[in-house]
């Protein structure tokens, strides 16, 4: 009997471990890699870095296009426009085939990734999902007067309450999304103008006076990421006097604030390795590492951290961020010294209590609850981004299940063990 209970408990625990690992994360590139008919869609997710953004989020639905539908979209438009169109196919809520046919009132508006980019005007970043007659489900722009030009065709993959991948027969086209002007070389390469407008005039002036702006501009076509300190960041305590640096050191410092690749926020959130900068060379690493705190991205130099504050521009293949601290490379300013460990407290000898003649019996005090242990308020590294805005009629239970999966798993194991061993 005991052996049977132990085996049952083992099987139950194993099944829960499977569930726990299932809800822990997803990789859209791997999900689509086994299906050749989505190879073009998958390739564009990687080129535009939307794959990283999708992987950094939870409770999400991706509406995929087969190669035929994708060619009609990608063949006629630049990469920046394709990215906007594809971001409209990423719904910030979980929709599986069952939920599509159980919409309250048969229709709903749901938020998409496009709405979070800042490019969507009004409600152009929302999608209309409608359960049609005959078991069909239509998708269209939420803009007034828009038609349901796209239809659900089949399910591709579901990781319950985490990610759902559904195929649709045509892209969802919001008014103006395909006619949006591609970033011109003059517009994007006017980096100093963008920086000055964003409150980074000191940084912009240094780029011009040092000649590093030419390095930035020559990198634009292949990809460029800039971390621009604000004017206030240069006035902060601890920022070294740049006049004490050699010209070569100033150049290295400024180049340390840029990457020779397009790396938007979603890519930085999922990054695990050291990142090479424009200053990286054989003589020194000059690299950066990243961590996350909720939806925030923090850059680490070895000297001190700096938080991504705002996005100045994100137009494939160029992204410019403002940061709240000047990035100080350890190669120039040395690594931050770790605080010395606190000395161990010296134990005082325990005094021997004096013997009392006869103890007086005191009334039993009311038992008090022990104080709760201190709670670490800092988010763990790699913590998931903040939950996206739920669409109308979204399933709150689904979101709760995903977020609380570890706690639920622990509780279920405890209950199962107790019931089986009694």
Curated annotation (Swiss-Prot):
<dbReference type="GO" id="GO:0005886">
    <property type="term" value="C:plasma membrane"/>
</dbReference>
<feature type="compositionally biased region" description="Pro residues">
    <location>
        <begin position="340"/>
        <end position="374"/>
    </location>
</feature>
<keyword id="KW-0449">Lipoprotein</keyword>
<dbReference type="GO" id="GO:0005829">
    <property type="term" value="C:cytosol"/>
</dbReference>
<protein>
    <recommendedName>
        <fullName>Fasciclin-like arabinogalactan protein 10</fullName>
    </recommendedName>
</protein>
<feature type="domain" description="FAS1 2">
    <location>
        <begin position="187"/>
        <end position="327"/>
    </location>
</feature>
<comment type="similarity">
    <text>Belongs to the fasciclin-like AGP family.</text>
</comment>
<keyword id="KW-0654">Proteoglycan</keyword>
<feature type="glycosylation site" description="N-linked (GlcNAc...) asparagine">
    <location>
        <position position="244"/>
    </location>
</feature>
<feature type="glycosylation site" description="N-linked (GlcNAc...) asparagine">
    <location>
        <position position="190"/>
    </location>
</feature>
<feature type="glycosylation site" description="N-linked (GlcNAc...) asparagine">
    <location>
        <position position="27"/>
    </location>
</feature>
<dbReference type="InterPro" id="IPR000782">
    <property type="entry name" value="FAS1_domain"/>
</dbReference>
<feature type="compositionally biased region" description="Polar residues">
    <location>
        <begin position="386"/>
        <end position="397"/>
    </location>
</feature>
<dbReference type="GO" id="GO:0099503">
    <property type="term" value="C:secretory vesicle"/>
</dbReference>
<keyword id="KW-0677">Repeat</keyword>
<keyword id="KW-0472">Membrane</keyword>
<keyword id="KW-0325">Glycoprotein</keyword>
<keyword id="KW-0336">GPI-anchor</keyword>
<comment type="function">
    <text>May be a cell surface adhesion protein.</text>
</comment>
<feature type="lipid moiety-binding region" description="GPI-anchor amidated asparagine">
    <location>
        <position position="398"/>
    </location>
</feature>
<feature type="glycosylation site" description="N-linked (GlcNAc...) asparagine">
    <location>
        <position position="162"/>
    </location>
</feature>
<dbReference type="InterPro" id="IPR033254">
    <property type="entry name" value="Plant_FLA"/>
</dbReference>
<feature type="signal peptide">
    <location>
        <begin position="1"/>
        <end position="25"/>
    </location>
</feature>
<feature type="region of interest" description="Disordered">
    <location>
        <begin position="336"/>
        <end position="397"/>
    </location>
</feature>
<feature type="glycosylation site" description="N-linked (GlcNAc...) asparagine">
    <location>
        <position position="128"/>
    </location>
</feature>
<dbReference type="Pfam" id="PF02469">
    <property type="entry name" value="Fasciclin"/>
</dbReference>
<feature type="propeptide" description="Removed in mature form">
    <location>
        <begin position="399"/>
        <end position="422"/>
    </location>
</feature>
<keyword id="KW-0732">Signal</keyword>
<feature type="domain" description="FAS1 1">
    <location>
        <begin position="26"/>
        <end position="172"/>
    </location>
</feature>
<dbReference type="InterPro" id="IPR036378">
    <property type="entry name" value="FAS1_dom_sf"/>
</dbReference>
<dbReference type="GO" id="GO:0098552">
    <property type="term" value="C:side of membrane"/>
</dbReference>
<keyword id="KW-1003">Cell membrane</keyword>
């Amino acid at each position: 009997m005991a052996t049977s209970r132990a085996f049952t408990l083992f099987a139950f625990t194993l099944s829960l471990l499977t569930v726990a690992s299932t809800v822990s994360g997803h990789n859209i590139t791997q999900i689509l890699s086994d299906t050749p008919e989505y190879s073009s869609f998958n390739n564009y997710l990687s080129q535009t870095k939307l794959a990283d953004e999708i992987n950094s989020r939870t409770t999400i639905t991706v509406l995929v296009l087969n190669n035929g539908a994708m060619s009609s979209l990608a063949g006629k438009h630049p990469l920046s426009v394709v990215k906007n169109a594809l971001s409209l196919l990423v719904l910030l809520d979980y929709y599986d085939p069952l939920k599509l046919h159980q919409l309250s009132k048969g229709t709903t508006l749901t938020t998409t990734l496009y709405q979070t980019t800042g490019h969507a005007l009004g409600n152009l970043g929302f999608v209309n999902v409608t359960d049609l007659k005959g078991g069909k489900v239509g998708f269209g722009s939420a803009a007034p007067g828009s038609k349901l030009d796209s239809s659900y065709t089949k399910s591709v993959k579901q990781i319950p309450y985490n990610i759902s991948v559904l195929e649709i027969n045509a892209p969802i086209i919001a008014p103006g999304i395909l006619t949006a002007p591609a970033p011109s070389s003059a517009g994007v390469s006017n980096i100093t103008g963008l920086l000055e407008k964003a409150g980074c005039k000191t940084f912009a002036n240094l780029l011009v006076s040092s000649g590093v702006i030419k390095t930035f501009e020559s990198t634009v076509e292949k990809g460029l990421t800039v971390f621009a300190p604000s004017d206030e960041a240069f006035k902060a305590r601890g920022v070294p006097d740049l006049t004490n640096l050699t010209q070569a050191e100033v150049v290295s410092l400024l180049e340390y604030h840029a990457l020779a690749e397009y790396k938007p926020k979603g890519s930085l959130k999922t990054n695990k390795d050291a990142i090479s900068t424009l200053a990286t060379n054989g003589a020194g690493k000059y690299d950066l590492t990243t961590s996350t705190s909720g939806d925030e991205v923090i850059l680490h130099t070895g000297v001190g951290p700096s938080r991504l504050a705002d996005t100045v521009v994100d137009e494939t293949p160029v992204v410019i961020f403002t940061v709240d601290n000047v990035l100080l490379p350890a190669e120039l300013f040395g690594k931050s010294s770790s605080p010395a460990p606190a000395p161990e407290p010296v134990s005082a000898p325990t005094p021997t209590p004096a013997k009392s003649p006869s103890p007086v019996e005191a009334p039993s005090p009311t038992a008090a609850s022990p104080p709760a242990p201190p709670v670490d308020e800092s988010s763990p590294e790699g913590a998931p981004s903040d939950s996206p805005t739920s669409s109308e009629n979204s399933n709150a239970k689904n979101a709760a299940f995903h977020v609380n999966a570890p706690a639920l798993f622990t509780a279920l194991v405890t209950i199962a063990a107790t019931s089986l061993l009694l």
